[in-house]
Amino acid sequence: MTSELEIDNYKCIICDGNRFKEVFNLEKISKKPYRIIKCSNCSMISIYPIPSKDFIQRHYNDPLYPKSAYFRNMTINFKGSPEVRLFLKGLNLIEKFYPNKGKILDVGCSSGIFLNMAKDRGWETLGIDLSKDFVNYTKKNFKLDIRYGFLKDFSFKENSFDVVTLWDLIEHVREPKELLKEVCRILKPEGIVLILTPNQNSLIKKTTNLSYKLSFGRWKTPANVVYDIHHLYYFSKKNITILLTKIGFKTVYIGKEETILNRIIGEESDHWIKKNKFMVFGLRLIFFIAKLTGNKNKLLILSRKKRILTNII
């Protein structure tokens, strides 16, 4: 049985607890000095220790970052790419719950495709990203207002935006609670935040955890693929809803979406794929079953800022 860890200088972002259990030791899996830990009280999963701000900025400004397989279809020639269908679904959801088009901020906007779609639909758009290459790319190709930096760097006025979007962002942030507080502050009353983040209770996560346990830690490759050191927090439907409620939001929609598998294994070489063909086949099978059963790898959440905020943490 996994022993409990008490970490004095680290608290769970959901319940403020400081007792945790180790899920994975990434040093044993990938020789990276981190652990994946689970809160003993509320089961929130995170990485420990949290990487530094400088480490995060260096990662997003690596010249290879915008060229990775994850962004292969996220260029000016985006029409018809499967990733864009999710952006379209998100935009339709936003307009369903917030039909009066206004000002939209995309935090972590990458190549600007979502903002370009929103602009074409009549929204006033603004984007922020930590990749200077993406900021320059988006300005050049889409002529959008994109700025480099963290959200708090800009000190936007209260009630500035109608909508804020966090596409595949919140799991990468060192302090997601503080991020959501700032989002709440700059949103107008009854404004919308849309979040896309990996689903910790997805079939792929459950299968990865089980395979690691059944192999007594010997089969490390799935865990190394699924638990990325740049994902700092792993949310479930339950704990993301709790966090949003504490901040001052009412969640009005939660759906499950699938990650496009090639955005995961596309990072690997042909040699790696051939060497791990059994695992790649297994991943394809798991994604197929997850699609049939609805136990997909992503959560799409839409929450509304409460008109009157009380007891905000």
List where the protein language model places each region.
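Active-site beta-alpha loop architecture of Rossmann-like, nucleotide-cofactor-dependent enzymes
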Residues: 171
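S-adenosyl-L-methionine-dependent methyltransferase catalytic module, highlighting the catalytic core
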Residues: 166, 174-186, 192-307
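Conserved N-terminal segment of class I S-adenosyl-L-methionine
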Residues: 1-159, 163-167, 177-180, 256-257, ...
